[in-house]
């Protein structure tokens, strides 16, 4: 996790968009010491609907001041991935040991792990630079 965060620090705006309440998000951020990496923290407290509603990703994109189509979403659950897709984000599934049997066929990319996801994001960034466009 830390390697991936450091890899993109200063290169991409980063946000957390979690279906958990802010108090739980704060516990995790404090334990892992990762809050400094993120430009936006979006918890379910400000959102009327849970995932798979796109609302949480739309709100995070708005706070980042970017279009949803300019966002890459990493998700480990089918409902979360569907939320990202419905928001119009480029969605990457990173299934966990608990969700790997779920059907992620609707996402743009299924990563084996965070390293694979990071490599894919870097290839998207490279394509964007070459063609001066957002995928």
Give the ranges of each region predicted by the language model.
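A residue-level structural signature of the nucleotidyltransferase/glycosyltransferase Rossmann-like core
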Residues: 13-14, 109
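Conserved phosphate-coupling serine/threonine residues in phosphotransfer and NTP-handling enzymes
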Residues: 18-20
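Asp-based, Mg2+/Mn2+-dependent phosphohydrolase catalytic module
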Residues: 2, 6, 22, 26-135
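Internal catalytic-core helix/loop-beta-alpha segment
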Residues: 5-8, 14
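Glycine-centered short loops/turns at secondary-structure junctions
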Residues: 11-12, 88
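Hydrophobic beta-strand core positions in alpha/beta domains
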Residues: 15-16, 93
